[in-house]
Amino acid sequence: MATKKAGGSTRNGRDSEAKRLGVKRFGGESVLAGSIIVRQRGTKFHAGSNVGMGKDHTLFATADGKVKFEVKGEKNRKYVSIVAE
């Protein structure tokens, strides 16, 4: 006979992989066209001048230059722009 009662099963023990979101190029950094600037879910940051947005809301540079973060507009939205050097 077993001297230990059988342990029950658990419904926990799973977690999703981290998605590596966040700012990839910070303000003042030089970037080349096509460089990813921000990986995000939704529009935490909006695309400014010389910045494009992918279908998953990733912001990327469309021209060479320096990254500039700014808050503007009535709703105080955060914009990311590329300023030509």
From Swiss-Prot:
Keywords: Ribonucleoprotein, Ribosomal protein
Disulphide bridges, residue numbers: none
Record-level GO cellular component terms: cytosolic large ribosomal subunit
Region described as Disordered: spans on this chain: 1-20
Gene3D superfamilies cross-referenced by the UniProt entry: 2.40.50.100
Metal-binding as UniProt keyword: no
MF terms (GO), sorted A to Z: structural constituent of ribosome
Gene Ontology biological-process annotations: translation
Top-level taxon of the source organism: Bacteria
Residue ranges of the TM segments: none
Protein family membership: Belongs to the bacterial ribosomal protein bL27 family.
Name listed for the protein in its UniProt record: Large ribosomal subunit protein bL27
Originating organism: Haemophilus ducreyi (strain 35000HP / ATCC 700724)
